[in-house]
C-alpha cells in the first residue's frame, strides 16, 4: 500500500479558525484523537518473527504474515501507536493504586476534585505502523511512500519487539483532530513531549502524567496539517495520478488559509543508520 501526502504548518492563532473551515468543507465535526507513539529502532537484521514470543501468540496468522513482511525488509525506525484519552493522563492515583484502605474514594470530600480512573498499560491496544522513506525523483509534487500497519498484542510490547530485532528509543504523544473528505484523511495535529525526568527511561511509560504537564514540541504552539490518501495498489499509475489530483484539489480549496506542499524527503527518512 502507498500513501500520498501534502503538509502545511499552521500557526497557533490560526488553529481554531482552520478547524471551523475544515468542518464546513467536510460537513462533519472534528474527531479528536490522542495517541501514544513509541519509537523502536532495528538493532540487527530481523529474521522471521517467532510466533511463540510472548503475547504474539494471540495474533492471527494473516497479521503475523504482514508483520514478517514489514519487519524483514531492512533496518528501519518504526512506530507503535496506541489510542488514549485525556482521562488516561494523570489518572492513576498513587494512593489508590497502592491499595491503601485509607485512600480517598471517588466522591469523598478531601478538598480536591479526585476521581479514580486507572490507566491500564496491560490492556493498552497497539498497532505497528511502518513508513518507508519517501520515493525519490517523483515527478508529482506530492510525498509518496510505502506504508503498512498491523495489529499487535496488548500491554507490554517491548518483549516481542526486542525479539523481532527492535529496541525502544523514545515516545511522545500526538494530539489532533481528524476530518474525512471523500478519500482524503485530513489531520490537524501537534506533537506533545512528556515532562522531563531525572533519569532517562529505557522502556515505555506504564503511567501517564497529568495532561497539563505535557508540552508542545514546537515551542510556538504551531500545528501540522497533513492531508493523505492511501492507495492499495501503488503500481497502478492511474490510481496514483487520481489520488494526486484529489490532493491538488484540496490544496486549491485551502490556498487562502494554508499552503499545502510536499515534504522534504530526508526529513521523513525512517532508515536506521
Curated annotation (Swiss-Prot):
Which terms are listed as keywords in the entry? Activator, Nucleus, Transcription, Transcription regulation
- Pfam families linked to this entry: Med18
User: Is Mitochondrion found in the keyword set?
Assistant: no
Where does this protein have compositionally biased stretches of type Low complexity?
90-106
Mind listing the GO molecular function terms for this protein?
transcription coregulator activity
The protein's matches in InterPro entries, at most eight in alphabetical order, are given as:
Mediator_Med18
Tell me the compartments it is located in.
Answer: Nucleus
Enumerate the residue ranges of region (Disordered). 90-114
Cellular component, GO annotation: core mediator complex; mediator complex
Please list the GO biological process terms of this entry. regulation of transcription by RNA polymerase II; termination of RNA polymerase II transcription
UniProt xrefs under PANTHER family: MEDIATOR OF RNA POLYMERASE II TRANSCRIPTION SUBUNIT 18, MEDIATOR OF RNA POLYMERASE II TRANSCRIPTION, SUBUNIT 18
Q: What this chain does, per the record? A: Component of the Mediator complex, a coactivator involved in the regulated transcription of nearly all RNA polymerase II-dependent genes. Mediator functions as a bridge to convey information from gene-specific regulatory proteins to the basal RNA polymerase II transcription machinery. Mediator is recruited to promoters by direct interactions with regulatory proteins and serves as a scaffold for the assembly of a functional preinitiation complex with RNA polymerase II and the general transcription factors.
Q: How does it assemble?
A: Component of the Mediator complex.
Q: Which family does it belong to?
A: Belongs to the Mediator complex subunit 18 family.
Q: What protein name applies here?
A: Mediator of RNA polymerase II transcription subunit 18
Write the gene name.
Answer: srb5
Amino acid at each position: 500500500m502507498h500513501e500520498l501526502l501534502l503538509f502545511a504548518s499552521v500557526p497557533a492563532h490560526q488553529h481554531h479558525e482552520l478547524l471551523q473551515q475544515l468542518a464546513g468543507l467536510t460537513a462533519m465535526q472534528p474527531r479528536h484523537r490522542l495517541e501514544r507513539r513509541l519509537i523502536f529502532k532495528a538493532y540487527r537484521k530481523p529474521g522471521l518473527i517467532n510466533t511463540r514470543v510472548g503475547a504474539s501468540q494471540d495474533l492471527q496468522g494473516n497479521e503475523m504474515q504482514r508483520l514478517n513482511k514489514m519487519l524483514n525488509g531492512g533496518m528501519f525506525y518504526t512506530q507503535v501507536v496506541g489510542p488514549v484519552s485525556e482521562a488516561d493522563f494523570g489518572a492513576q492515583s498513587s494512593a489508590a493504586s497502592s491499595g491503601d484502605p485509607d485512600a480517598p474514594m471517588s466522591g469523598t470530600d478531601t478538598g480536591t476534585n479526585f476521581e479514580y480512573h486507572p490507566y491500564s498499560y496491560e490492556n493498552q491496544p497497539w498497532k505497528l505502523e511502518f513508513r518507508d522513506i519517501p520515493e525519490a525523483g517523483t515527478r508529482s509534487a506530492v510525498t509518496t511512500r510505502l506504508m503498512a500497519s498491523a495489529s499487535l498484542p496488548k500491554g507490554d510490547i517491548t518483549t516481542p519487539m526486542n525479539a523481532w530485532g527492535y529496541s525502544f528509543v523514545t515516545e511522545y504523544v500526538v494530539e489532533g483532530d481528524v476530518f474525512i473528505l471523500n478519500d482524503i484523511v485530513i489531520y490537524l495535529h501537534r506533537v506533545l513531549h512528556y515532562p522531563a525526568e531525572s533519569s532517562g527511561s529505557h522502556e515505555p511509560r506504564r503511567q501517564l502524567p497529568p495532561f497539563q504537564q505535557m508540552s508542545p514540541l514546537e515551542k510556538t504552539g504551531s500545528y501540522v496539517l497533513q492531508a493523505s490518501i492511501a492507495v492499495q495498489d501503488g503500481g497502478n499509475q492511474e490510481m496514483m495520478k487520481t489520488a494526486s489530483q484529489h490532493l491538488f484539489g484540496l490544496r486549491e480549496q485551502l490556498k487562502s488559509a494554508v499552503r499545502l506542499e510536499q515534504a522534504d524527503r530526508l526529513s521523513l527518512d525512517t532508515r536506521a543508520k
